[in-house]
Amino acid sequence: TETRPVFHKGQHHLVALLQVSGRDKCYLFRLNKMGVPSCIIHLLEDTTVPKIGLSLGDDMNMLHHRVKFSPGRFIDLQKMVSDFGIKDLSLQKLYANIFHERISKREQLSNWESDQLNPKQQLYAATDAWTCINLYETLTELRQTGDYELVKTDEEDQHV
């Protein structure tokens, strides 16, 4: 999910964007424009379809301010990577440590409630969702094969 950033104490905003991604496509739902349709609620509650993300507790709390639902089969990558002994739980660091590639988080603090999302926001939101799937699949494979080694560097980063 993406929410308009807060810059003043006591201010809060509702979730503006929900990303739903597969391996090849990502759909961006502008919840601030369309509300939460019943098909999205059904997806959120579906226990057969895994929903993968990072720090999902925060997302669940924010989504519940918009609509009440019973979460079904959510997989939080933060819990998964802790099984590997990885301590830095940010998406950017996880992706860099596992894939040795960098992803930009520059658009994270942009206005997700704007009339139109610009191409950079769209790319950021889609990448954010797709990255979680990619990490999940890779970590699942590594867990099954045991083909990884945790390496600590001088910076205390953990690399798989």
Model-derived regions, located:
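Acidic two-metal-ion nuclease catalytic site recognized across multiple nuclease folds
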Residues: I133-V160
